[in-house]
Amino acid sequence: MTNTRKSHPLIKIVNHSFIDLPAPSNISAWWNFGSLLGVCLGLQILTGLFLAMHYTADTTTAFSSVTHICRDVNYGWLIRYMHANGASMFFIFLYFHIGRGIYYGSYTFMDTWNIGVLLLFAVMATAFMGYVLPWGQMSFWGATVITNLLSAIPYIGPTLVEWIWGGFSVDKATLTRFFAFHFILPFIITAMVMIHLLFLHETGSNNPSGMNSDSDKIPFHPYYTIKDILGILFMMTTLMSLVMFTPDLLGDPDNYTPANPLNTPPHIKPEWYFLFAYAILRSIPNKLGGVLALVFSILILMLFPILHSSKQRSMSFRPLSQCLMWMLVANLLILTWIGGQPVEHPFITIGQLASMTYFFIILILMPSTALMENKLLQW
C-alpha cells in the first residue's frame, strides 16, 4: 500500500513542494527569504483580517476606527502594529530576496523571475493602498501626490486620475475602493506566489555556485524545514521587538494627525521602503519623465536576464562584478536617504547623481564588467 502522503491528490502536491522536494545541498541562508516572505504574507493576511473586522472605510470615521482598534479592541494595538511593521519586514525580505537573485544569477529562470517582478509590483500597490487607510495627513497627501502622477500620461491622464479618485479629489469614494483593493490584492498575490513556486519547481533551485546541482540533491524535509524554522524564529524575534519596543520607529508622526485637505504637511514622503523610488521620481524636473523613471526603476529588473553577458551564472567567483553589486546596494541606500530629505541643495544634486548612477551601474557597468571578466578568464 502506498503512503497517503505520496498518493492523496492534495497531500501529494504539498509533499512534492515542501517534503520530498529535491533541493541543492549547498544553499545558504540567502535562500531562507522565500519561506520568510511566505510567512510574512500569511501573517499580513491574518492580522489584516482582524483589523478589517473593526475598521470602517469612511472618511469621517476611518481615523477614529483605527484609534478605537488601538485603545478598545483586545490586543488591537498588537494586531495593528504587527500589521504595520510586518509590512516593513515584508519589504526588507523582498529586497534581500531580489538582491540574492541578482547576485547569484537566479534571474536566468526567466519565468520565475518575471512573475517575481510582477509580484513586487502587486505588493507595492497593496502597501501603498494600505498606507492610505488610517486616513492621517500622510495617508491623504501621499494618496493625492501618487495618484496625481497618472495625470502625466498623455491624453488620458487627467480623466484616468478622476476615474481612480471617483470624484474631483481624494475623498470617500477613493478610500472605499482603496480598502476594497487592499483587501483583495493579498489573495491575488497568494495565487501569484503559487505560480512563482510552480515555475521554480519546474527548474529546481539555483545555488551559490551557480552550477547544476542535480548530482547532489537532498530532501527539503527535514534539512530545509528546520533551517526555515530557524529563520522564522529570527524574523519573529525582530518583528516582535520592533512591535513591543518601538512600534512607530518606521512610521511618520504626521500620520497621527487626521487628514486635512486644507493643510499640506511640509514634507510629503512615503513609507521608508518606497523612498529609493521616490528619490528617483523627484530627481527628474519633468513630471512625465519622473513617472517613467519611477516605473522603469522597478521594471529594469526584467532586463537582468537580457543584460547578463557573463559566461558564469553566479557572481560568487567574479570579484569585479561583486564590487559593482555592493556599489549598487550602497547607491540604493543613498537614494533611500535622499528620498526622505527635503527638496533643497545639496540633496537635489545628490539625488540626481544617485539616480543616474543607479541606471548606469545596471545598464552599462554590470554587463561590460561581465564581458571584461570573460576576457580576463580567457573565455
From Swiss-Prot:
GO terms of biological process kind: mitochondrial electron transport, ubiquinol to cytochrome c
GO cellular component terms listed in the entry, alphabetical order: mitochondrial inner membrane; respiratory chain complex III
Any GO molecular function: metal ion binding
Localization, UniProt: Mitochondrion inner membrane
SUPFAM superfamilies documented for this protein: a domain/subunit of cytochrome bc1 complex (Ubiquinol-cytochrome c reductase), Transmembrane di-heme cytochromes
Membrane topology: Multi-pass membrane protein
Superkingdom of this protein's organism: Eukaryota
Pfam families tied to this protein: Cytochrom_B_C, Cytochrome_B
Listed CDD domains: cytochrome_b_C, Cytochrome_b_N
Residues given in the record as heme b b562 binding sites: H83, H182
Required cofactor names: heme b
Annotated residues for binding of heme b b566: H97, H196
Stored InterPro entries: Cyt_b/b6_C, Cyt_b/b6_C_sf, Cyt_b/b6_N, Cytb/b6-like_sf, Cytochrome_b, Cytochrome_b_C_euk/bac, Cytochrome_b_N_euk/bac, Di-haem_cyt_TM
Binding site for a ubiquinone: H201
Cofactor note: Binds 2 heme b groups non-covalently.
Residue ranges crossing the lipid bilayer per the database entry: 33-53, 77-98, 113-133, 178-198, 226-246, 288-308, 320-340, 347-367
Family: Belongs to the cytochrome b family.
Function per UniProt: Component of the ubiquinol-cytochrome c reductase complex (complex III or cytochrome b-c1 complex) that is part of the mitochondrial respiratory chain. The b-c1 complex mediates electron transfer from ubiquinol to cytochrome c. Contributes to the generation of a proton gradient across the mitochondrial membrane that is then used for ATP synthesis.
Note: Heme 1 (or BL or b562) is low-potential and absorbs at about 562 nm, and heme 2 (or BH or b566) is high-potential and absorbs at about 566 nm.
Protein name listed in UniProt: Cytochrome b
Gene source species: Ctenomys flamarioni (Tuco-tuco if the Dunes)
UniProt gene name: MT-CYB
